[in-house]
From Swiss-Prot:
Organism field: Shewanella baltica (strain OS185)
Localization, UniProt: Cell inner membrane
UniProt cross-references to InterPro entries, sorted A to Z: UPF0761_bac, Virul_fac_BrkB
Family membership: Belongs to the UPF0761 family.
Chief place where the protein resides: membrane
Keywords of this entry: Cell inner membrane, Cell membrane, Membrane, Transmembrane, Transmembrane helix
NCBIfam families xref list: PRK01637.1 (NF002457), yihY_not_rbn (TIGR00765)
GO CC terms: plasma membrane
Classification via Pfam families: Virul_fac_BrkB
HAMAP family registered for this protein in UniProt: UPF0761
Protein name per Swiss-Prot or TrEMBL: UPF0761 membrane protein Shew185_0314
Membrane topology: Multi-pass membrane protein
Annotated transmembrane regions: 4-24, 45-65, 102-122, 137-157, 182-202, 213-233, 247-267
Amino acid sequence: MTKKIELAQIRVLFLGIWHFLLHLRRRLVEDQINIRAGHLAYVTLLSLVPMVAVTMSMLSAFPVFKGIRGQIEGFVYENFLPAAGDTVQVYINEFVGNASKGTAVGIAALVVVAIMLISAIDKSLNNIWRTKEKRSVVVAFSMYWMVLTLGPVLVGASLVASSYVISLKVFEAEALSGMLPIFIARLPMLFSVAAFLLLYMVVPNQKVKFLHALLGAIVAALLFELGKKGFALYVTQFPSYEAIYGALATIPIVFVWVYLSWMIVLLGAEITAAMPEYLDYESSSDDETALNAKPLADASQGDSPSVLTSAEVTALKAVAKSE
């Protein structure tokens, strides 16, 4: 009897996952995330140099980050532009150096282009959440400016904190020395989960439950790490793009990776936004099933079945939700 109950519970669990995946698929088709990802990839490439320039400018304003600029650049290139090659890094650093020597008007233009990227991300995620109420211009600009200024500082602070933790003497003990490589290897994954979690909870202009955002963040982080390794493997093992594009091969490489990255980000957002919709639908379906089962119970007891009208079902469901 216990085994039958366990099998039934497992079956219900898998059916629930299957129904959620079907609901997620309908949502993905409806929201056309491939088109949204293409738009965000284009805006990202347009604002890549301004974003890096603003980031490095913010970090250079704090003396504590001056000694780890190379470490921060390595972290960004390794995790966000995998297998793009040294050529891309040299060009980006050269562009950033040229941009930082510009006039006040030029620097202001860089900030505006960087804010355009943050605004595009904000609009795309709020469209996924079906948010009807828009932020005021003052609130939106304040949030964009906060992300632009505090984001680089948080990245730098997290790397400084990681370096400090790794240098602690507690890791020199024999019992913990084997844990250090594992901890270092898991750091990018932890950073990805934290970044996606913050993105899915802060950007939507409505309340997002922590567990829903955490689920979307974990899925997105896993896909992001797998995508990095898979894309790097493809670029190194199947370099057919070089035969086609020659010296310009780095351009499609960067664009394809940025596009795939945004597909992963939007997929995690869709999972986070779809969870409450699916749970509400399942809850309302259970309520309706229980209400419609009442006439059958009356008939089994010999009473004339009291058929509920659709208005009565709706009213009872509203009462149940209010309770």
